[in-house]
A protein has these predicted regions:
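Short glycine-enriched loop/turn motifs at secondary-structure junctions
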Residues: 1-2, 24, 46-49, 85
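Terminal, regulation- and interaction-focused segments at domain boundaries
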Residues: 1-26, 125, 133, 137
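Solvent-exposed residues in well-ordered beta-strands and their adjoining turns
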Residues: 9-11, 57, 83, 95
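Short glycine-/small-residue-rich flexible loop motifs, especially phosphate/cofactor-binding loops
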Residues: 20, 37-38, 121
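Compact, glycine-rich, soluble single-domain proteins
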Residues: 29, 36-39, 43-81
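Short, structured loop/turn "capping" segments at alpha-beta junctions
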Residues: 29-32, 130
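Beta-strand/loop substructures that line and gate deep hydrophobic ligand-binding cavities in soluble
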Residues: 79-106
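Well-ordered alpha/beta subsegment
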Residues: 103-137
């Protein structure tokens, strides 16, 4: 699978805010927000680094996808991960939607995936103009 990923020179909290703003500018709706640090702490008593998952969706594209194929459409949701690595670097990543749909022989879904890829790249570019080298540690 292929991911779009970048490290940014801002705090985790600022990266979360910048990501949400960039998603909004590209007309994505945030359907769910999962604070993995909190979930792991409360359910497993594990102290984990800041790690947030945003379940984002372009509603017009989701509607088209559901109309085209009600099962395959589930593959087009964007799971945006914002995490702070142990070295302090903050990374934002999302699965490239064309990597999940590329093997499916469904013309409309492939078209939707390419449109979603374009919107995904745009919101990633909008977050921070100059990404930093990102090396998890």
């Amino acid at each position: 699978m292929h991911f779009l990923s970048k490290c940014v020179s801002m705090s985790f909290a600022d990266a979360v805010g910048a990501t949400k703003e960039a998603l909004e500018r590209q007309k994505f709706s945030i359907l769910a927000e999962i604070d993995m640090r909190q979930v792991l702490r409360s359910d497993l008593s594990v102290d984990f680094r800041p790690y947030l998952i945003l379940n984002a969706c372009s509603l017009p594209l989701a509607h088209r996808a559901i109309e085209a194929d009600h099962v395959i459409a589930s593959m087009l949701l964007c799971e945006v991960v914002i995490q702070e690595h142990r070295n302090g670097r903050v990374e934002i990543s999302v699965l490239d939607p064309t990597s999940t749909i590329g093997t499916i022989n469904h013309v409309e879904m492939i078209s939707i995936a390419h449109e979603l890829q374009s919107k995904t790249r745009q919101f990633m570019d909008d977050i921070h103009p100059a990404p930093e080298f990102c090396r998890a540690a």
